Amino acid sequence: MKILVTSALPYANGNIHLGHIAGAYLPADIYVRYQRLKNRDVIYICGTDEHGVPVTISAEQQNKTPKEIVDHYYGSIKNSFEDFGMTFDNFSRTTLPIHHHMAQDFFSKIYNKGYIYPKEIKQYYCPRCNRFLPDRYITGKCPRCGADGAKGDQCDSCSRWLEPFELVEPKCLICGEVPQKRRTKHWYFKLSAFADKLNEWIATKTNWKEHVLSFVKGWLREGLQDRPITRDMSWGVPVPLEQANGKVLYVWFDAPIGYISSTIEWAEKKGDPDLWKEYWFSKDTKMIHFIGKDNIVFHALIWPAMLMAYGDYVLPSDIPANQFLNLEGDKFSTSKNYAIWLPDYLRDFKADSLRYALTRNAPEARDTDFTWRDFQAWHNNELADNLGNFVNRSLTFIKKYYGSSVPTASTFAENDNRMLDILHKAPAGIGEKLEQFEFKNGLREIMKMTQEANRYFDHEEPWVTRKTNPLICERTMYVCMKIVTSLSVLLEPFLPFTAAKMKKMINFIPQQWDAIGAPDVAPIIGDTEILFQKIDDKVIDLQVSKLKKREISIEEFGKVVLKTGKILEAEIVEGSSNLIKCTVEIGDTQRQIVAGIGKEYKAQELIGKTVIVVENLKPAKVRGVLSNGMLLAADTKEGIVLLTTDKPVASGEIVR
């Protein structure tokens, strides 16, 4: 059997945060590391998703080219993953020629089979930006849950897949203009043709996670609709049809093909260009996609349908999608910069402390919450005081009283045999949890073992028996060394850096997962070190304060639409000496805006002034008067000063 493991391709428009890690990456790495210890044929494939609207939006907001954006974040993401201990066999990019060729081949094969067809449709068009708007360039309210900030393809609040025309109060994400509906042509994937096959296939997946099956069956019950797979953009994989000039493949069609192109790249690096076919075309391949729950519909319905349409390819064996990880009671939000970014974390803390916390609190079946206080408690109480304490007390005792030579024993008492029996059963018991993607429970079993080990050490009192009965002391320390040796392997999938330190300290004799129930113990230990230093309250206080006093991202700032305006009329609001009601021309429209500038300006002197307006501010009533926008001003010691332009500018121009 071959095992092909993938993690969802991260968008190369920003760094990775803890929510991403907990969802699609850490669980996969644990699983792959375990399979390697079982000496199984497994490869782990990933890469950055470098096409799509998130990239072009970031580029426009940062005044850069899409290539500049993806080049930067590919390196940043790859380095962060490596520092976190991720062990991809290949980490590719969807902008590589190998991927473009594969994606176009996929399109052409499915098109020639009749599963892709053209269709003239209406699409939103921004008259100010002078272009058709891809779905993520449109924002508005979700028609299902009412959340603001829903995109034209999906609502992040309720995970509902949306169509742009379903949005309530749609606007252009870049300029805030209300878009128009215009006709254009796109190519559609005939997803509806695979409804029966998908139903039959899903019916065989009784072992999948309950929430994954529930989500998929819900979509199937509602009926599958054909999906557009092209976009009016220049950034992406060009559609390989003459009549589709100027269009690219939709990222949801393009991205999963990246799993194949990344595997091809891996095979070429191995010097065997056809090796990838042994994984993708073999019925003996077990293909597992690790994703977050927001990607279920793409990986469990659309992607399998694409593979069915092409033919020959293996279908996913399992899709153990995780639920969401929240942060201090709120959702992670990249747009609001409410997140703990992996590069920032790794500057302050060790990777294994986070790997432990995210696995211990993994959102495997329900949403969970990450808090800095929990992180500190788990690190100090469970890693330092439990695991680290047992390893340290065992090794330092041997080093101090046996000159680093590990005692041996051939006969054991009842308590010794009890611990050895726990060791003997550990590989199979923990392995079963990992095979079923129950990583949290697998880690829990290991930590129970370390608790038992500490109790064993305390009960046997080697500091006493060293003097009263040296043979019992030697036996105790021999058992302790067997435990430490086993832990150095059992912990490797979860805490690889810690496991590596332990192996170095005990001069580890190489052995696989199945052998560590009765491990070989090295005769002499090496230099020892404390595995985990405790984290002080002040360090955690600083991290908590960073979330409260966070900087906003360029994406978040980009949501504020600033435009030039010209004040046409102005008058004092009745009953107020400070509020002035202004009629402001913004391009072809006029807005009523109330500003608290009456102490510095007389109403009449404002008429004709060019001002800077926040155009997309939610309307509000001020002293009972509707205000639809905001005038920007500087708050100086001498009073408020309205901001204007250095040179004459027409109203309605975008301010960057």
Say what each PLM segment does.
Residues S317-A321, K503-M505, K581:
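Beta-strand segments within the central parallel beta-sheet cores of soluble alpha/beta enzyme folds
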Residues S545-R656:
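Phosphate-backbone binding interfaces of nucleic-acid-interacting proteins
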